[in-house]
Amino acid sequence: MKAYQREFIEFALEKQVLKFGEFTLKSGRKSPYFFNAGLFNTGRDLARLGRFYAAALVDSGIEFDVLFGPAYKGIPIATTTAVALADHHDVDTPYCFNRKEAKNHGEGGNLVGSKLEGRVMLVDDVITAGTAIRESMELIQANKADLAGVLVAIDRQEKGKGELSAIQEVERDFGCAVISIVSLTDLITYLEQQGNNTEHLEAVKAYRAQYGI
């Protein structure tokens, strides 16, 4: 686990974006942890979040031409990631996002920002069912662009309805890499290294044994 990944986990815990306990997911599964990126909700939080996304992007080595943030949660993520790339990595990246409803006046259309062209890096908070990715792919293909990859905050590394995770299904269906700032494996490593969260560690390990990929 790299320094920025450890710092991200500590940041998420500090902001209660990441919590350990018992939580019922939409799928009905009882999870020993919960991640709610919506709680990164101040200017300082957003600035820090962008730095972690930018670090993961640079670390991945994936080449791309434009950042795309799917409405709604992806919009501030794409924006802050673009700012962090410029401020901390001297990379001036175009970014754009979509409207949920197309507009017929003014600039019109359903895209805001730069053109959606070339190799597109899609940024979002998490992938649960992959629905947002599939909707975004329609836009990307309609603009004759290519999906270079997808970056999310956390990879839960758990099976969906079948044997694959939602992220693995996206990788299979669209032939692109999906990267994350941290993964379930990183959370377990963090808990092991802390050494003072035995109860949470055992619960997360048991969850991985049951649902992990």
From Swiss-Prot:
- UniProt: 5-phospho-alpha-D-ribose 1-diphosphate binding residues: 26, 72-73, 99-100, 103, 105, 124-132
Pathway assignment reads: Pyrimidine metabolism; UMP biosynthesis via de novo pathway; UMP from orotate: step 1/2
Which residues form each disulfide bond in the chain? none
Single GO molecular function: magnesium ion binding
Q: Which GO terms describe its cellular component?
A: cytoplasm
Q: Which UniProt keywords apply?
A: Glycosyltransferase, Magnesium, Pyrimidine biosynthesis, Transferase
- What does the entry list as the binding residues for orotate? 34-35, 128, 156
InterPro entries reported for this sequence? OPRT, Or_phspho_trans_dom, PRibTrfase_dom, PRTase-like
So which cofactors does this thing need?
Mg(2+)
- A single BP term in Gene Ontology: pyrimidine ribonucleoside biosynthetic process
List where this protein forms a coiled coil. Answer: none
Catalytic reaction(s) noted: orotidine 5'-phosphate + diphosphate = orotate + 5-phospho-alpha-D-ribose 1-diphosphate
Entry EC number(s):
2.4.2.10
UniProt-listed PROSITE patterns: PUR_PYR_PR_TRANSFER
Q: How does it assemble?
A: Homodimer.
User: Which family is it part of?
Assistant: Belongs to the purine/pyrimidine phosphoribosyltransferase family. PyrE subfamily.
Q: Any idea what job this protein has? A: Catalyzes the transfer of a ribosyl phosphate group from 5-phosphoribose 1-diphosphate to orotate, leading to the formation of orotidine monophosphate (OMP).
Q: What is this protein called?
A: Orotate phosphoribosyltransferase
Organism placement in taxonomy: Bacteria, Pseudomonadati, Pseudomonadota, Gammaproteobacteria, Vibrionales
